[in-house]
Regions:
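Nucleic acid-binding interface residues in structured DNA/RNA-binding domains
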Residues: 1-103
Length: 103
């Protein structure tokens, strides 16, 4: 399936902007929510291109195991400031902190 990258970017931004403080989603969950469940890596690429001028709470996006981005040391501190705790292995407990969408 061909992806309209600009439309995909807008939809990813909308989902990420909606993640409430103290909750997280994975790249794969975001891809699924925007209707492209096989494009988790593209979600990551889109978020990597977000400028600081475009405030998006990208720190609330982790991988499917709850691991934070290896090249973004501040991410953990931002999540902790919102009350999110980490397991001994350094991952977010997705069962506890994942944003549960109603519906």
């Amino acid at each position: 399936m061909a992806v309209d990258i600009e439309e995909f970017r807008k939809e990813v931004y909308n989902v990420v902007a909606s993640i409430p403080s103290g909750r997280v989603l994975s790249y794969g969950q975001i891809a699924w929510l925007v209707g492209c469940p096989r494009h988790a890596r593209l979600v990551g690429k889109v978020l990597h291109g977000v400028s600081k001028a475009e405030y998006l709470p990208c720190h609330r996006v982790v991988n499917g195991n709850g691991r934070t981005a290896p090249c973004w040391e501040e991410q953990r501190g931002l999540l902790e400031a919102e009350g999110i705790t980490f397991r001994a292995n350094g991952c977010v407990d997705m069962r506890k902190w994942q944003w549960k969408l109603e519906g």
